[in-house]
Regions:
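Polytopic transmembrane helical bundles with strong interfacial aromatic enrichment
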Residues: 1-302
Length: 302
């Protein structure tokens, strides 16, 4: 079905957009185009320096809007038996437009912390919804054996929620310029518990603390799924999330050690988004009951 493919493309496109957004900030290109939606009064500025990254980010964002509009229209045409998919797509379209407006506001008001972090938060919420739609419209051929009783769906969604919170906290670290508030690794200012004397140190420290706790929880979850479940697709995704969370924490430390170099910082954002999407995918494809099969998540043949 074409709508299923369009949702998958939208997920990948959103991940690319999040990566580009991080590159824009890491290269200090966020205000390279001082106006919005144009750039120096034109839609075709000279693509050099920071303008290249900022305007490329805007062009990719515009492309995502068009791509998801197509996905929504295809969902309307092809999912008559599952109307919730079209309704969710409409909500996603609204969310995407609001997120784009917040992108403009970050430029107009010159990067206020709250608006910039809201811009990132809405992008992550859209990614979560797009992943839900993409995962709900796939066909999984593997038969599903008896389940272990471990609440995979519930745990995956809870952890996805915490990954979202941690990502928003990371956005605050970025937009408050708190990335080097703790300049050493793994300690902070040479201490396990640093003096929380200002907002940048406090935000950075709690971002690290939650990262360690969340990484431990995700690794525990992945271990339980891999060894308790026998369904191959869910075991494969358990390995993926375990790898992602280890790489994510590593990149967080590398970002500090390299003084917030563009590539590790941008990959740090990308992997957080990939981890969020992977957990939502696991929760969505996992059958609701032992009698269910993966086919319940497949699109109807209409």
């Amino acid at each position: 079905m074409l709508h299923a493919r369009a949702f998958k493309v939208s997920v990948v496109w959103t991940l690319l957009l999040l990566y580009l957004g991080s590159v824009v900030h890491a290269t200090e290109s966020s205000l390279a185009c001082p106006d919005w939606p144009t750039c120096f009064g034109t839609m075709l500025p000279e693509m050099t320096g920071g303008v290249f990254w900022e305007h490329l980010h805007r062009l990719v964002a515009g492309g995502l809007v068009l791509m998801f509009m197509l996905a929504t229209w295809l969902a309307y045409k092809e999912t008559k038996a599952r109307p919730w998919i079209f309704r969710a797509s409409l909500f996603g379209m609204t969310l995407l437009i609001v997120q784009s407006v917040f992108g403009g506001l970050t430029v107009i008001y010159e990067l206020p912390d709250l608006i910039s972090t809201t811009h990132l938060s809405l992008a992550l919420l859209f990614l979560a919804l797009a992943t839900l739609l993409a995962s709900s419209t796939i066909v999984i051929a593997d038969s599903y054996p008896a389940r272990s009783g471990f609440r995979v769906r519930a745990w995956a969604m809870v952890l996805a929620g915490f990954v979202f919170v941690q990502s928003v906290l990371g956005g605050l670290v970025r937009h408050m310029d708190a990335g080097m508030a703790c300049p050493d690794v793994p300690l902070c200012l040479g201490q396990i518990l640093p003096p929380l004397v200002n907002a940048p140190i406090t935000i950075h420290f709690f971002h690290r603390l939650l990262a360690i706790l969340l990484a431990a929880a995700v690794l525990w979850f992945a271990h339980r799924v891999y060894w308790k479940e026998t369904w191959l697709p869910i075991r494969r995704w358990a390995k993926i999330v375990a790898i992602l969370v280890v790489l994510q924490v590593t990149l967080g430390f590398v970002s500090v050690l390299t003084l917030l170099a563009v590539i590790p910082v941008s990959l740090h954002t990308l992997l957080a988004a990939c981890l969020l999407a992977s957990l939502i995918h696991m929760a969505t494809i996992f059958p609701r009951s032992s009698a269910a099969t993966p086919g319940v998540l497949a699109p109807p043949t209409n």
